Amino acid sequence: MAELKITQVRSTIGARWKQRESLRTLGLKKIRQSVVREDNAQTRGLINTVHHLVEVEEVGK
């Protein structure tokens, strides 16, 4: 299964509570922090919630 590299590029100042919690669930706390997550429906849903705060790129295994 493919993996996604998710990088936070914008601050959570002014973001809604649900967006902050989605970033926390993804494991992102600071700007320019990156995590690699499995590409599944749950991860895609979290990314969809915060698409304006993160950059996503596919990582080959």
Swiss-Prot record:
GO cellular component: cytosolic large ribosomal subunit
UniProt-listed GO biological process terms: translation
Record GO terms (molecular function): structural constituent of ribosome
Keywords tagged on the record: Ribonucleoprotein, Ribosomal protein
Record-linked Pfam families: Ribosomal_L30
Domain of life according to the entry: Bacteria
Keyword Ribonucleoprotein (UniProt): yes
InterPro entries xref list: Ribo_uL30_ferredoxin-like_sf (IPR036919), Ribosomal_uL30_bac-type (IPR005996), Ribosomal_uL30_CS (IPR018038), Ribosomal_uL30_ferredoxin-like (IPR016082)
Gene3D superfamilies linked to this entry: Ribosomal protein L30, ferredoxin-like fold domain
Lipid metabolism among keywords: no
Family: Belongs to the universal ribosomal protein uL30 family.
NCBIfam families associated with the record: rpmD_bact
Record text on subunit structure and interactions: Part of the 50S ribosomal subunit.
PANTHER family: LARGE RIBOSOMAL SUBUNIT PROTEIN UL30M (PTHR15892:SF2), MITOCHONDRIAL RIBOSOMAL PROTEIN L30 (PTHR15892)
Protein's recorded name: Large ribosomal subunit protein uL30
Gene: rpmD
